[in-house]
Amino acid sequence: MIVFRRFPTCLLHHIRQPASRSLLLESQRRSLSFTSYKYNSSHIDDDKSKKKLKNVFQMNSNRVIRKQKTKEELAKERFEEQLRSPNRFVRWGAIARSEKFSKGMTKYMIGAYVIFLIYGLFFTKKLFAKDKELERLLKKQEEGNANEYEALRIKELKGKLRRRDELKLEEYKKMQEEGIENFDDIRVQNFDQNKLNEQILPARDTTNFYQEKANEYDKAINMEERVIFLGKRRKWLMKHCQGDVLEVSCGTGRNIKYLDMSRINSITFLDSSENMMEITHKKFREKFPKYKKVAFVVGKAENLVDLAEKGKPSLENEKENQVKYDTIVEAFGLCSHEDPVKALNNFGKLLKPDGRIILLEHGRGQYDFINKILDNRAERRLNTWGCRWNLDLGEVLDDSDLELVEEKRTHLGTTWCIVAKRKGDVKKKDELGFVEKYLQSSIRKRMESFEKKDDMASKKELEPVPPVSKS
């Protein structure tokens, strides 16, 4: 009898699939062997890297590894290098940025301020003393009691000494050193540069010269004026024109393009050359064809007063018989006049009260080397342009009856920009300088207040003390 036993299902599953199990075991074995290989190989790589690092460390055992510096440390090193720099300006710059210098700067500032105050005090006292001396001398001059030395001293205090005045003042100072103090009856010889300088040629009548030069004058002079930017100066000259205007030595009318007719009531042109006056007339009519209050007169500046009176009805009062102008202008005319001082005096006679004379001229410069050049080329200049460009215009102005309001010089002092008035006329507000307008008056008032306080204090000290009553 055959007996069949029932096996469990799980056991039958394993018996029936022997191949699949063997495959599973094989895959597990391979996985384990691969892991072992990776582990072993990683150990091998670690050993190689360790050996390599060991070799590198042995090679670089003498090299010093430094810590990376901060910005502050780098800036400090750079500052120390600048302090040791061979360039002095670099060293000074580093010192100025140092902490020690910054701390001491306050002391320097305080010291500088104290020095400034002390200097300002002495300067103010000196300025006040000069102002008081000038006031005293001017008062004496108005009374007609000032001698020649005092007149020169007035010019020196005003800063208006000419070369001949400097030479005269030197003679008076020599007398002072010898012990002479009273100069009332003493007069020093004149050192007129316009007469003593042989390079300054004598004046002559230039009418015929400019008659022949008229047609080519503008073309010949254009380049010279452009090089020295003379148009700017001509513009300055004509901007002063207002009211009734007279232009003397108008030439070919080179100033017409700078006229502002909205500020002008009437205008008169004067020149000794008829040919030049025709060119002026043509230029004016081209620019202002409808303007009616204009006159073109041919004549000399030395005969200006006679020309103004010509054709006028005679009146009992001669002054009312003359034509008067608010503004008289002239550009480069004094150097061509036969008598420049007389011409200036004529300007003053035809000027209205509070009127102004505006001059643009050339003459001697402010430096000796430029004056030597002018002297050496004086004859050539006279023959080419008909002018004496090395005249000392300061002497000419001082010898006239005019009083200077403004004097500016350019081109090394050879170009003179002058504003003048009649003697006795008061300066306008806009003609007062900053020092004259604000500083001198305030300093005078301040110092006078100090003097009053000192006088009051001295009077109190001199007053008798009342006796104390005994009770």
Curated annotation (Swiss-Prot):
**What CDD domains does the database record attribute to this sequence?**
AdoMet_MTases
Q: Which UniProt keywords apply?
A: Membrane, Methyltransferase, Mitochondrion, Mitochondrion inner membrane, Transferase, Transit peptide, Transmembrane, Transmembrane helix
Q: Please give, as recorded in its UniProt entry, the membrane topology of this protein.
A: Single-pass membrane protein
- Which residues does the entry place in the Mitochondrial intermembrane compartment? 124-471
Name of the protein in question: Methyltransferase OMS1, mitochondrial
One of the record's GO cellular component terms: mitochondrion
Q: Tell me the organism.
A: Saccharomyces cerevisiae (strain ATCC 204508 / S288c)
Q: Reproduce the miscellaneous comment text.
A: Present with 504 molecules/cell in log phase SD medium.
Ranges for the region named Disordered are 450-471
Here the segments flagged for biased composition (Basic and acidic residues) are 450-463
